[in-house]
Structure formats: structure tokens, C-alpha cells
Design a protein with these regions (language model features):
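Acidic/polar, low-complexity intrinsically disordered N-terminal segments immediately downstream
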Residues: 21-110, 115-117, 126, 281-319
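C-terminal motif of bacterial Sec signal peptides marking the signal peptidase cleavage site
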Residues: 14-17
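Acidic, serine/threonine- and glycine-rich low-complexity intrinsically disordered segments
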Residues: 144-235
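Extracellular beta-sheet/turn segments enriched in Thr/Pro/Gly and aliphatic residues
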Residues: 149-178, 185-187, 270-319
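Intrinsic-disorder/low-complexity, polar/charged segments enriched in Ser/Thr/Lys/Arg/Asp/Glu/Gln
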Residues: 36-38, 114-116, 168-170, 181, ...
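Sec-dependent signal peptide recognition
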Residues: 2-9
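Tryptophan-paired
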Residues: 71-140, 195-281, 311-319
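Beta-strand secondary-structure signal
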Residues: 36-40, 90, 128-130, 170-172, ...
Length: 319
């Protein structure tokens, strides 16, 4: 299927230091030999288009069904730009145990030499290592959980690694996308009177279990407001979107949508319930977002898959 994957090749090389953000617990045995390791992060893609499915009642979102592999791909879907997927790499090392003990936490940015290449050295032992690629400047790691100030496109891997003194380690590892994207597309045009569009989300998923990459529900609210300018007047198909980690099925999201005019009067409100994000997919809603309601209309739900955020699954919803 369509996937964006981050591929890291770990091999034995000379140890180099980067000017990254680093938290490290000193090793009490300073005489123990260290084994230098290098992780190089890259991007890979696979493609699987999805069919159009219509007239699904209410907001019941089914699992996507793979399309005939001979079907044509949506030509409007742009290629992925790897430079825009992430600008932070977190490298978190735990000494394996019951419980695991945090050994070090390093964060790399594009300002570091050889960004996407992680140099490290570890003494012999058993380790759990977590990799996160994302764009949040304010990530907070506590134990084996991570809290994000705002969820961005995020890729993850948690692996078990044995390190032996003098051992040569060459290993391919793959980071998987662990977020879904919720997107609202306007079917109506931006009017001169329109000022802003706000999304209020209940049960926003901005915390994860680092061992699995799964979202941890904690009833967090999230608000996002997009403001229009003069160049937007008359345009349609505006996208308003946010990323989220994947909750357990019993913790679905709810979104309240509201458009306001220049004097801060609400011109349109919509409530979207029971949103269950899908990992590596866009859940796309298309409908009237700004214009005052005059009659009943429908809200079309699209689901797009992964890296290139590909072809939609359409669903009709009643107000």
C-alpha cells in the first residue's frame, strides 16, 4: 500500500559529535569500551491507490479497501517533498530492564552537521532505542512517553538492540508514520465578509507511548484558527487540517467548526462527531464551511492514504 517510510542504516563507524540538544545519564563505568554506531535516516515510498465509495450513512468510517492495482493514480496528488516532512530527530536510548532506564536523549535539527545522520557510541549491553522524526520544537519526554505541544507529521521506531564489545553492527531499520491527518475542505467560496475559520477538537491526541507509537488519551482540547486575507476572496477548496496521533477506538475525536465574519459573528457552525483517525491516512471532509445555512446539505467524507496522501474514499453525511 502507499507508505512513507523512513529508512535508517546502522553501521559501525568512528564516533563523531553533533551540536544537538542532548540529555545523557553518565555511565559509571568509564573504563568500559564503547562501540561507535552511525544511523543514517532516509525516505522511501510505496504506492497503493484507493477506490471511491459513496453513500455511507452518518459518520461511520470503514477500513479502506485496496483498489485494483491497474487503476490510474490521481494525477492531482503531488509528490512528497522529504525536506518538509520533519525538521527534528529525537534519539532516545534506554538500558533494557524492569523498568527500562533512560540512558540518553538527543535531538538533532537541520542546523547540526550531517542532519539525518546520528553518531553515537554505547557500552556492551541490551538496549531499547526509540527514533522520532517530527517538527515539534517543544517535545517533552518522560519515562517512555512523549508529549507534543502540537502534533506534526511524525515517524517512529522502537527497537531492541544488543551491543557487544568490539561487535560490528550493520542493520537496516524502518520508521513508520504514526499520525493521521484530519482535513476540512470548503465547497463554498471565501467572501469579502469572512474573517476566520476555527476548529475546536475534543480528545486531541498529542501524547504517545514511545514503545508502541500509539496515542494516549487524556481529554486534551485543541483549537486552531485560520485567518483569511484579501487574496483569498472568491477562492474555494480551502484546506483546514491538523495532525493527530491514533487513539484507541473508544476515544474518538469530535470537531466543532465555526466561521466568523469581520465583526466576529458566527456565520456557519458544524459539528463532526465520532472521528476515528487512521494511521498514515487523511480523513478528508468536503462541504459548506463558511456560508450561512439556508437548507439541508451533505458533508462528503474522503479518506486518503499515506505518503503522497493519495486517492479519496467519499462518504455522504447528513447535517
Amino acid at each position: 500500500m502507499k507508505k512513507n517510510e523512513l529508512v535508517a542504516i546502522a553501521c559501525l563507524l568512528c564516533f563523531c559529535c553533533c551540536n544537538e540538544t542532548e540529555k545523557e545519564v553518565p555511565n559509571p563505568d568509564l573504563q568500559e569500551e564503547l562501540s561507535p554506531i552511525q544511523f543514517t535516516i532516509d525516505l522511501q515510498k510505496e504506492v497503493l491507490p484507493f477506490p471511491v465509495t459513496k453513500s455511507i450513512p452518518e459518520l461511520n468510517i470503514p477500513e479502506p479497501i485496496p483498489q485494483n492495482p491497474d487503476a490510474e493514480e490521481d494525477p492531482s496528488t503531488p509528490d512528497i517533498d522529504p525536506d518538509n516532512l520533519y525538521n527534528r530527530i529525537d534519539y532516545i536510548v534506554y538500558q533494557s530492564g524492569k523498568p527500562d532506564i533512560l540512558v540518553k536523549h538527543k535531538q538533532f535539527t537541520p542546523q547540526d552537521p550531517d542532519f539525518t545522520i546520528i553518531y553515537d557510541s554505547l557500552p556492551s549491553g541490551d538496549y531499547h532505542i526509540c527514533f522520532l522524526a517530527h517538527s515539534d520544537k517543544n517535545i517533552s519526554v518522560s519515562g517512555q512517553t512523549a508529549l507534543f505541544s502540537k502534533v506534526s507529521d511524525t515517524f517512529h521506531l522502537f527497537l531492541t538492540q544488543e551491543v557487544q564489545t568490539g561487535e560490528r553492527i550493520i542493520k537496516d531499520i524502518t520508521l513508520q508514520r504514526i499520525v493521521g491527518k484530519i482535513e476540512f475542505i470548503s465547497a463554498d467560496a471565501v467572501s469579502k465578509a469572512l474573517k476566520s475559520f476555527t476548529i475546536n477538537v475534543s480528545n486531541y491526541q498529542n501524547k504517545i507511548d514511545l514503545t508502541t507509537g500509539n496515542g494516549i488519551s487524556q481529554n486534551t482540547p485543541y483549537t486552531q484558527t485560520d485567518t483569511f486575507n484579501d487574496s483569498d476572496i472568491g477562492k474555494t477548496n480551502f484546506s483546514h487540517s491538523f495532525f493527530t496521533f491514533i487513539p484507541a477506538p473508544e476515544f474518538m475525536l469530535k470537531a466543532h467548526l465555526s466561521a466568523k465574519n469581520q465583526i466576529n459573528e458566527v456565520t456557519r457552525e458544524r459539528e463532526v462527531n465520532d472521528i476515528l483517525p487512521l494511521i498514515n491516512h487523511i480523513i478528508r471532509y468536503t462541504g459548506i464551511l463558511y456560508t450561512p445555512k439556508e437548507s439541508d446539505d451533505t458533508f462528503t467524507l474522503d479518506i486518503l492514504n499515506d505518503g503522497k496522501w493519495d486517492s479519496p474514499i467519499d462518504k455522504d453525511l447528513k447535517d
